[in-house]
């Protein structure tokens, strides 16, 4: 009889730990969903076409050369994507 009680407590503990893990995971996903993230791509120069393609391939986002008024050698690729 004591063995059954120990097994029941053990299984309930495991069950609640697994449920708690999924609740925490859901909270983390909910926090980052819908937010906009940004990142810079390293490189020697920025070509708008290549920048946009690289950002789309890497993060499924869009890329622009920043600052827009600089020469291609002084600009860098700035990516915007959904977190």
Swiss-Prot record:
GO terms for biological process: defense response to fungus; killing of cells of another organism. Its main location: secreted. Transmembrane segments: none annotated. GO terms for cellular component: extracellular region. It comes from Arabidopsis thaliana (Mouse-ear cress). This is Putative defensin-like protein 131. InterPro entries: DEFL (IPR010851). The keyword Lipoprotein does not apply. It comes from the Eukaryota. The keyword Disulfide bond applies.
